Regions:
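Extreme N-terminal starter segment of soluble prokaryotic enzymes
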Residues: 1-2
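Conserved hydrophobic "DFG−1" position in protein kinase catalytic cores
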Residues: 5, 22, 46, 102-103
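Short N-terminal binding/cap micro-motifs at the start of the first secondary-structure element
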Residues: 10-15, 41-42
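Short beta-strand or tight-loop elements
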Residues: 13-18, 63
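Residue-level marker for the onset of beta-strands and adjacent loop->beta junctions
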Residues: 16-18, 53, 97
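Glycine-rich beta-strand-centered segment in the early N-terminal region that forms part
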Residues: 21-38, 47-89
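Conserved catalytic-core motifs of eukaryotic protein kinase domains, centered on the activation segment
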Residues: 44-46, 96
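NAD(P)H dinucleotide-binding glycine-rich loop of Rossmann-like/cofactor-binding domains
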Residues: 83, 87-108
């Protein structure tokens, strides 16, 4: 899959489009094919100044998409459900600036 990442703080010029493995949902998680990734002030402020907690970060907290896979313990009838994502990058390495995102129901 494709994802936007940054490896250092700075303006939008630090963003890079890269290839990454498509995430597989873990127990209790769903995988969302992201259709829309929203950018809000929290996203660009974090990219500009917040110390990185890992070597690279996929930005953006908000988005929407469709569940395309479920992990163990999740009803497979959820596949095809349209969902809204919020705080997807909060305390995680992966935000919504990617083609796919795995998250727990009700929490990213």
């Amino acid at each position: 899959m494709r994802a936007v990442i940054y490896r250092e703080n700075g303006p939008s010029s630090v963003l890079r489009l890269v290839g990454r493995p498509t995430p597989e949902p873990e127990p209790g998680e769903v995988r969302v094919q992201v259709h829309t990734s929203g950018v809000n002030p929290t996203d660009w402020k974090a990219r500009s100044a917040t110390p990185l907690s890992s070597p690279e970060q996929v930005p953006n907290h908000d988005g929407s998409g469709v569940i395309d896979a479920v992990g163990p313990g999740v009803d497979p009838d959820r596949i095809g459900e349209r969902v809204w994502l919020w705080e997807a990058a909060r305390q995680r390495l992966g935000g919504t600036a990617a083609e796919y995102l795995s998250c727990r129901r009700g929490t990213p």
